Amino acid sequence: METAIESIQAREILDSRGRPTVEAEVHLVNGSMGLAQVPSGASTGSFEAHELRDGDKGRYSGKGVLTAVKNVEEQITPNLVKINALNQNLVDSKMIEIDGSPNKSNLGANAILAVSLATAKAAANSVGMPLYRYLGGPQASLLPVPLMNVINGGAHAANNVDIQEFMIVPVGATSFKEALRWGAEVFATLSGVLKDKGLLGGVGDEGGYAPNLGSNQEALDILIAAIEKAGYKPGEQVALALDVAASEFYKDGNYIYDGATHSPSELIDYLASLVDQYPIVSIEDGLHEEDWESWVQLTQKLGSKVQLVGDDLFVTNGSRLQKGIDMAAGNSILIKLNQIGSLSETLETIDLATRNSYRSVISHRSGETEDTTIADLAVGTRAGQIKTGSLCRSERVAKYNRLLRIEDELGDRAVYAGVIGLGPKSRS
């Protein structure tokens, strides 16, 4: 069979934080090849698939991935050789079966995902299709609105800002190319605004600035100033989004932010006040990943106004998403390939979300590589939204540039999601 898997290679490479990660090559009988690299997160949900690290303190402070690489070569490869790469479900289910654990802890989600993605790329190459077309068919023509993380706080930066990500969202653009330009211009202007205030410093893991600010509101005020100074209208042309990452400042049933301890209802009221004051269209992880009842209350209060995204809450896991659907907790899901650990399961989760009117936001991780799979995934699934960081750091920009190429390839068929990719407030 020409599209059968002939060989698989894996190696230890570095991610954008200088930490080891897994890269895999899948070679088919017909000579087609797929190459994939897996990312890793800093702020990770407790229910994510297991990222296998060596634990050898003498190498990379214990963060090496040679065990995962060895698992690809010695356990995965012998079981996948001769399997048709066009049968993604079979490839993935075979690896999950070999692993045998509930969270991919035996082989490692990083080993399984690297092979899963490389297989899909090899299969796409074998039939002469770009990955987005292979995944989504002829209807894959929707370019996502980017949620651009331009001010970093929380676990992504060494500063005193509680909220992890402050994002700009170019909802009013007419094309992805225009959206990217708007974002880049606001980001460049933001540099000047911070410099004028004596706040310009380094950037965080995802390329956003990480200034020491007096409050979370100050970050929002600075973003509004940058949007206006760049010549755009806040809300109408460029909106705002937050990743609160509330699990990171949750302790004993309460939330510690702004230097004080607050109840879940106080945090909900605080987020509601921000939505009233600023053109915020999306809030991610507004509450702790196990604070389900508070999530229901948050959704009742804000779900008709803004997008409420579950990241740590859902961890790209279909069973957790189903619980959220049943409870009416949140209205959107963040999709991170390495949270669940295979392409097939990721696509199943996106399908479950779509069937239940939950939106999907395709996302990078804070520890990234030059792999651009998520750009193709966003277009292939018609997700309408992507999170892939700021407008600097090449591992972030690589995804934006891939989307520019896809838009060019699609030509007149390309449609930019803009406000249709987002929640109720942006459509009102």
UniProtKB/Swiss-Prot annotation:
Keywords: Cytoplasm, Glycolysis, Lyase, Magnesium, Metal-binding, Secreted. Its EC number is 4.2.1.11. The gene is eno. Disulfide bonds: none annotated. (2R)-2-phosphoglycerate binds at residues 164, 336, 365-366, 387. The keyword DNA repair does not apply. The keyword Lyase applies. GO terms for biological process: glycolytic process. This is Enolase. It is found in: Cytoplasm; Secreted; Cell surface. It comes from the Bacteria. InterPro entries: Enolase (IPR000941), Enolase-like_C_sf (IPR036849), Enolase-like_N (IPR029017), Enolase_C (IPR020810), Enolase_CS (IPR020809), Enolase_N (IPR020811). Belongs to the enolase family. Coiled coil: none annotated. Catalyzes the reversible conversion of 2-phosphoglycerate (2-PG) into phosphoenolpyruvate (PEP). It is essential for the degradation of carbohydrates via glycolysis. GO terms for molecular function: magnesium ion binding; phosphopyruvate hydratase activity. One of its GO terms (cellular component) is extracellular region. Binds a second Mg(2+) ion via substrate during catalysis. Pfam families: Enolase_C (PF00113), Enolase_N (PF03952).
